[in-house]
Amino acid sequence: MSKNTINLQDNVLNQVRKNKITVTIFLVNGYKIRGLIKSFDNFTLLMEVNGEQQMIYKHAVSTIIPGKTLNLFSDQSDKNDQEQ
């Protein structure tokens, strides 16, 4: 990947984690999980659900729905404006 490539997955996960936005996650088996993303890596999500931690493997995730609209490209456009 080039240096300027935007990683949408990491941007979404970072924004909901940093802003403590509640997410609803649907797994491939249809199970629904609602909570906060505390951390993530290439393979897993660590969530806080009802005061308890759950580690979820990304390959089991079907859909992630943030509790509010995200502004994904504001940080990237601010960086581009500063570089010019």
From Swiss-Prot:
Residues in domain Sm?
Answer: 10-70
Sorted UniProt keywords: RNA-binding, Stress response
Query: Which GO cellular component terms are attached?
Result: cytosol
- Reading the lineage from the top rank, the first entry is Bacteria
Query: SUPFAM superfamilies, from UniProt?
Result: Sm-like ribonucleoproteins (SSF50182)
Its Gene Ontology molecular function terms? RNA binding
Which biological processes are named by the entry's GO terms? regulation of DNA-templated transcription; regulation of RNA stability; regulation of translation, ncRNA-mediated
Briefly state the protein's biological role: RNA chaperone that binds small regulatory RNA (sRNAs) and mRNAs to facilitate mRNA translational regulation in response to envelope stress, environmental stress and changes in metabolite concentrations. Also binds with high specificity to tRNAs.
Q: Which family does it belong to?
A: Belongs to the Hfq family.
Summarize subunit and interaction data from the UniProt record for this chain: Homohexamer.
Its protein name is RNA-binding protein Hfq
As recorded in Swiss-Prot or TrEMBL, the protein's gene is named hfq
